[in-house]
Amino acid sequence: MSVTYREAGVDIDAGDALVERIKRLAKPTRIPEVLADVGGFAGLCALPGGLSEPVLVSGTDGVGTKLKVAFATGVHDTVGIDLVAMCVNDVLTVGARPLFFLDYFATGKLDVDVGEAVVRGIAEGCKQAGCALIGGETAELPGMYADGEYDLAGFAVGVVERSRILDGKRIAAGDAVIGVASSGLHSNGFSLARRVLEKEMGLTMSDRVADLGGTVGEALLTPTRIYARAITALLAACGDAVRGLSHITGGGLPGNLPRVLPDGLGARLDLGSYQRPAVFQVLQRGGPVEEAEMRRTFNLGVGLVAVVEKGAADRAIEAFAKSGEQAWVLGEVVSVGDVPFEERVLFG
């Protein structure tokens, strides 16, 4: 008696059914530069007009163990937003406009409804970012993942005029450091967060915590902010006064802000200049987790940092506000001399 691919654990019909659903989800994300529909061997996207020296900008990332929260809660339609955010926000830091996005979804046994929910989130993230979902890969890998689990990876490409690339080289001592609010943990630090909440505090994802304003799962699954519209507004309002942008991800402020600062420069930040979101307070008390560990693990409520000329700080904050983002003066750029990377962010 013959053996089939389905009996070996790969259901081609389920994969085809998911592709048809993905086509419908991707269609509303299409931009004028896209030249082909989802479903071919390759996605096609033309460079936008009006650029004399267009430079392509790429970024790739995943969602990490935030996926464990999706598995535990059965909520799968937000981690796709996180996936787009993690890739697109990196591309945005050099001043690029996001063009297109591709995803990789891998699972042991394909559940078409779960796959559709994940891609629905990806499509929503692409809409927020103004980029097109032009393709991806769905891999059914029997025996590679536990039942009901999957992994995600994403890849974003944007474009920027060569002369408008933000590389941080013009940052100078005295420049203002503008903090832009995160929505919570975003997509980093979840291994520590889950350890504190589940092991140290004995909570489940369905438990309600007054300080969180809902369940543990709801607080943790809050989607990562996508700053595409905000950065477009910032650049329009402030132009060359924008000196650099930093996406605050794993490593927190000390691990990310120095990546855009020239040698010899650091930043003095005032963490008392804003209200730290409740989720971080719950985690710090619940561990307990030392402040230094909090700073190098979580974004602490700051999802993006913009470095601008001091005189442009008010304009920058206003531009962020008009695009729906909360922003404030978090600190300033200072001279620090020859110090280790991790010591270039000072907290005062």
From Swiss-Prot:
CDD domains: PurM. Pathway: Purine metabolism; IMP biosynthesis via de novo pathway; 5-amino-1-(5-phospho-D-ribosyl)imidazole from N(2)-formyl-N(1)-(5-phospho-D-ribosyl)glycinamide: step 2/2. Keywords: ATP-binding, Cytoplasm, Ligase, Nucleotide-binding, Purine biosynthesis. Transmembrane segments: none annotated. Its EC number is 6.3.3.1. GO terms for molecular function: ATP binding; phosphoribosylamine-glycine ligase activity; phosphoribosylformylglycinamidine cyclo-ligase activity. It is an enzyme of class 6 (ligase). It is found in: Cytoplasm. It holds the Pfam family AIRS_C. Belongs to the AIR synthase family. This is Phosphoribosylformylglycinamidine cyclo-ligase. It comes from Sorangium cellulosum (strain So ce56). The lineage of its organism: Bacteria, Pseudomonadati, Myxococcota, Polyangia, Polyangiales. The gene is purM.
